[in-house]
Amino acid sequence: MPKLEQFEIKKYWQIFSGLSPSDNKVTHDQVAPILHNSKLEAGVLGKIWFLSDIDGDGNLDFEEFVICMRLIFDMVNQNITAVPDELPDWLVPGSKVELVRQRASQGGVAAASAAPASAGEAPEMEWYMSPEDRALYERLYQKCQTATDGSVGYQGVKPVVTEHFQKITQPELEQVWALVNPKGFAAIDRDPVMYLFHLLRQRSDVGAKIPAGVPASLGETFAKERVTTDIANEGQGAIRKSELHIASASRSNSARPKNENSDYSATAGTDWEVVQLQRELAALDSQLSDLKQQQESAPPTRAEVLREQFEGLLKFKQAQLSTSTNSSPAMNVLSLTEDIDSLEEQVTVLQHYLSTRSETLQQLQWEIQSLK
């Protein structure tokens, strides 16, 4: 397994920041698209998650995220043929050495993934759900933290599973979650949640074997597309290609000595919130620049053109009046006065219209400025 390079850690930081971590941690739901895109088996992903989540809080901080990404890419690029039972020393961050030792003393992955005790061979999973079972799972579903559309995320179902199926380990929950959520959605609908409880209950009560696939009759139910308004995760599907290049580039590097821990100093002092705000500011500046260009290139308004024409006509009539030598001055003066009055009324109307448009323009400029 090639050693972990600094350029690799920096790239993982960019991916981590793009997931919008909270308190410098990302949830399973946030990482789920990357896990799904790896195309690794659910059991493998469950083991990788367990190894990465060193403190066992169900989330990954940046150091744990690096471990998760590196194990995934090593499996995808076939740098390793199986996920190790324990993390190699060079992949363990110095701040978590003691936690890793404590977990190893408690049995590590072997203890976490041990199946419930049962006599003889583990029974097959039963997919049929009786009305009594459905009523029970409906009550459990009501305890989950649901979205407005009734969907449930991984973190929304996990507390209920922990409370009612205490024999279920996290890798087993990960495996069953992937089974009823084959497309790796951030949240699943009510029916997949019911089957999640159904499978976990059998696993917990009688040690039933978790199946590798689902019946064809349920495949469409579990893979059904959901309409989502969450734009935070857009573009995550494109992450995989760029990250795979990182792990591939490290194949030829020599392995780090076993007693050396990973150095995560490359991201010291980095503030992911600053990165996010800088991106938003750059986007707003671009929008403001486009609006200014449109304003400068816009043709004169109809009101401005008409005003210039009427002002020119007014000056012409005034010049005619001052130089008139007609024998009927009173009649000409009266006619010109009426023309001037009419023009002045029209100019007044146009000035009022121009003033209104100017106020509208000022309001738009104020809104543009507030975006910055």
Swiss-Prot record:
The segment annotated Disordered runs over 242-267
SUPFAM superfamilies hit by this protein: EF-hand (SSF47473)
- Name the residues that bind Ca(2+): D53, D55, D57, N59, E64
Q: Tell me the protein's name.
A: Actin cytoskeleton-regulatory complex protein END3
| GO biological processes | actin filament organization; ascospore wall assembly; endocytosis; endosomal transport; reticulophagy
A GO molecular function held by the record: calcium ion binding
Please tell me one Gene Ontology term that the record gives under cellular component.
Answer: endosome membrane
Looking at the record, the residues that make up the EF-hand domain are 40-75
Q: Where is the composition biased (Polar residues)?
A: 249-267
Annotated membrane topology is: Peripheral membrane protein
Q: Which residue ranges does the record assign to the EH domain?
A: 8-98, 133-225
